[in-house]
Amino acid sequence: MIQEQTMLNVADNSGARRVMCIKVLGGSHRRYAGIGDIIKITIKEAIPRGKVKKGDVLKAVVVRTKKGVRRPDGSVVRFDGNACVLLNNNSEQPIGTRIFGPVTRELRSEKFMKIISLAPEVL
């Protein structure tokens, strides 16, 4: 469950380390984002010579949350932290070329098949 001002880790090699959610996209008064939702973020911490720099405002897709996601069989998949993958503002394709850590099957839509194929593990 991600809302405005939530700090997230970055699960790709775009050069960002920590980001902050500044808006949950998809509705005028939408409060929370879960796994697979697109959010607007600003970069708070980045490595030198990365593809992005501190202060950049981008879109990102949430790939892991502490709250987790409930499956139709009743099971819940939870993670130790909140993480996202940075997206290009126009094409909504991932900026990085590698994904770190597991992602969930809930991302398996037409828009995020690239993230699924790059991920080392799909839960």
UniProtKB/Swiss-Prot annotation:
GO molecular function (one): large ribosomal subunit rRNA binding
One GO CC annotation: cytosolic large ribosomal subunit
Domain of life: Bacteria
PROSITE patterns: RIBOSOMAL_L14
SUPFAM superfamilies found in the cross-reference section: Ribosomal protein L14
Pfam families per the UniProt record, alphabetical: Ribosomal_L14 (PF00238)
Record keywords: Ribonucleoprotein, Ribosomal protein, RNA-binding, rRNA-binding
GO BP annotations, alphabetical order: translation
Family in the record: Belongs to the universal ribosomal protein uL14 family.
Record's subunit section: Part of the 50S ribosomal subunit. Forms a cluster with proteins L3 and L19. In the 70S ribosome, L14 and L19 interact and together make contacts with the 16S rRNA in bridges B5 and B8.
Role played: Binds to 23S rRNA. Forms part of two intersubunit bridges in the 70S ribosome.
Protein name: Large ribosomal subunit protein uL14
Upper taxonomic lineage: Bacteria, Pseudomonadati, Pseudomonadota, Gammaproteobacteria, Enterobacterales
